Amino acid sequence: MIKEKESERTMNKKIAIITGASSGFGLLTTLELAKKDYFVIATMRNLEKQIDLISQATKLDLQQNIKVQQLDVTDQGSIHNFQLFLNEINRIDILINNAGYANGGFIEEIPVEDYRKQFETNLFGAISITQLVLPYMRKQKSGKIINISSISGKVGFPGLSPYVSSKYALEGWSESLRLEVKPFGIDVALLEPGSYNTNIWEVGKQLAENQSDTTSPYKEYMDKIQKHINNGNDTLGNPMDVANKIVEIAEARRTTLRYPIGKGVKFMIFVKKVLPWRLWEFLVLRSFKKM
């Protein structure tokens, strides 16, 4: 719970909640918002992973602006406990649905259960936490919800169908959400990053694990995708750029729905939109043949 002394300290601060704050975009965004004097409720599934965040916050003298809270967005018991925690808070200004991971493999060989797990975190987790905070924002007639999507929510890549489909779903849900809550003074925005140097790119290892069968008919295709991911490691963007963009959206008086960010992301979205599908398909498949 937020203790009485902490409540006094947060009285004149904007309060932000961010899921998946133990690393990557979540950790960096927590620190950047704290620098802007937000009181940040930094949630994570495993509290043992808070060490890096707390260490960096202490070095920057930001610990007074950060409250680490356990939250597994896929576990109803954890969500219920988080709801009890929220009962001690008088307002919520920003929600950043950042918790997520990427699963890969080829559709024929991926168990349906893997798709369910992917959606539980990347989509249903965001829905669950959003449902918790909406009554606060609606009552105060203000608030901002920032959903961390991906270029994979706009472009379907082979070998990544669980992740791609979960992000496409997040995009459609966010569009509906924005139209539903806009009349209550609540904004919804989607951030669509390209490839960045975060641990979400453990997907490369996941791909290898899912496709380790040397007799798989997709083995050669998988090897090419694996090579593409590995070759891209040297060109991954700086995740601080994404954290800064999230803060920019949080601070903006007005927001649009979608914010693509990253090398080549806007161009790729534009090209896919204007090209006939047959030409787009030809270019994508040809790019893999050249590997």
Where in this protein do the model-derived segments appear?
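Substrate-binding pocket helix/loop in short-chain dehydrogenase/reductase
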Residues: F106-I107, D114-R116
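Conserved glycine-rich cofactor-binding loop
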Residues: I15, S22-G24
